[in-house]
């Protein structure tokens, strides 16, 4: 009984960590050759990221004055996919992924509550 409770708790803990980066791996395969996805790396300057990815569809200030976040819309075969690139206060890429800036901010808020 004790072992099954521990196993269940460990399984739940492992799965809860996955809940914060909800990204479809198919999106990465579909858009992997897009300059925004392929070439933008953590630590890159905002200027260089904008040169590679082009102008963002919108830019947001991150909560807590942590930096800014650019929303992009990737297009392929009639399908639109949101993609965000977040920059720290030094205008360096700190994260990116297949979601909007608003979804990214929500994930950050949920993680900080834990």
Protein language model regions, located:
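Residues within mature, well-folded domains
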Residues: 19-114
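Bacterial N-terminal signal peptides that target proteins for export
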Residues: 1-6
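Regulatory sensory/coupling modules that transmit signals to nucleotide-handling catalytic cores
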Residues: 8-11
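C-terminal motif of bacterial Sec signal peptides marking the signal peptidase cleavage site
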Residues: 14-17
């Amino acid at each position: 009984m004790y072992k099954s409770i521990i196993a269940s708790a460990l399984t739940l803990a492992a799965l809860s960590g996955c809940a914060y980066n909800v990204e479809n791996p198919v999106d990465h395969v579909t858009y992997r050759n897009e300059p925004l996805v392929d070439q933008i790396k953590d630590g890159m300057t905002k200027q260089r990221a904008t040169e590679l990815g082009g102008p963002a569809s919108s830019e947001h200030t991150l909560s807590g004055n942590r930096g800014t976040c650019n929303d992009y819309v990737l297009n392929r075969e009639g399908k639109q996919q949101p993609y965000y690139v977040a920059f720290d206060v030094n205008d360096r890429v700190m994260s990116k992924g297949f979601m909007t800036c608003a979804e990214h901010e929500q994930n950050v808020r949920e993680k900080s509550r834990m």
